Amino acid sequence: LICLTSPVLGQINVGYPRVIYKEDNDDDVVSKQYVQRFIDATKADMFFANKLIFVEGVAEELLLPVFARYLNKNLTDEHVLVVNMGGRYFNHFLKLFDTNNPYTINKKIVCLTDIDPCRKKNEPDEDYEACYPYEYNIDTANYNYKHHADTEVAQYAAHPNIRFYRQDVTYGKTLEYDIMRENPDCELLLTNSVSNLKEIKAMMAEQDMNKMMSKMRNSEANTRIKTSIGASKWTDEEKRKALLASRYLNSVSKGSNALELNVVLMANLDKPVADRKEFHVPQYIVNALTWLLS
């Protein structure tokens, strides 16, 4: 397989995927096997796109095209392909496109990943578990904390053709969390597949934190949310956003909710401007698409 790309008018780059993965390198052998299985199954069209967005799951795959439309962009017109990796397997594919190395394919690549804050107890044999942004570094005497993809974000920050983007390091968690955090008053998000629909809608109608918390049903998960947010030093505005985002995150199924949200957001966009409800694309996705399409 030989891949020809033209990143600049009049310039031709030649990529040789076969020679990128070294047979005497164990990591490369594993990566090559994964890439071969993946491409044989569904994704050979990535070689024909001008630019690529690698995502971890179906929610990003379904929502990115409509997010682009809200930014007055069209991924199809820009020949951008969204590739769902089905997990955190970016490293296997980035070897194909890393232009710091010879024989690679010169395409602009964005990798979208969740920041996923997590913590583990300062005790032997403990594992990291997911935590909320407002719990991060709140109890350093008893927990260690970390974010996902710190290494990758730094590694590719100045790369010629690859970038990693994720949610805000202070307030972010996942795509679904950020959608609600940046749209805390947007009822478009309350699709039929959202459980606890009436509860979240009632919370949205309140501005006072105590009144919002009073709308939440009793559960261990909700008690943790309320206790942790109450201990946070964030502003009331950020606490309100976080409370709604946490409740929303725990009430959605990624695939079905993303499909319904895609339909609802497109229908909103198709209305006359005066009739549209306000919706904000999560900022990390705005940043990613701005870089990719520049």
Mark where each language-model region is.
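Structural recognition of the conserved hydrophobic beta-strand(s) that form the central parallel beta-sheet
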Residues: 1-5
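Acidic, divalent-metal-binding catalytic cores of TOPRIM
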Residues: 9-294
